Amino acid sequence: MQDSRRPCIVAGLRTPFARSGTVFKDVTAVQLARRVTQELLERTALDGREVSEVAFGQVIQSVLTPNVAREVSLLPQLPPTVPAFSVNRACASAGRAISYAADQIARGHADVVLAGGV
């Protein structure tokens, strides 16, 4: 790849581990993704206007909110026009979203991509 930029992960955050059916049993995947993303934006002091795109993986998509990335992109810290899409590749969903983000940066299509998964 000529003139490739070298992407880097600037910050990462995740929810604590918990047994299934316990502390997170009443929290939706979208709520988890939004909480973690909000906290990440606050900790890094990243200006949401710098985000070029949002990519999220979701192992089991909800019928009510099939595009978790779009739900995350509606956070008040991000511009409402930021493109967002979700990936579904079973357990590799988040990894694929992060890989896509790195590719977009390496190819010069984006400067900052918010990527993750639930």
What are the residue ranges of the model-derived segments?
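Conserved "HGTGT" condensation-loop signature of ketosynthase/thiolase-family condensing enzymes
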Residues: 1-82, 118
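Short, conserved beta-strand segments within well-ordered enzyme catalytic domains
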Residues: 53-55, 86, 113
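Short pre-catalytic strand/loop immediately N-terminal to key active-site residues, enriched for Gly-Thr
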Residues: 81-89
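Active-site-proximal alpha-helical scaffold in enzymes
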Residues: 88-118
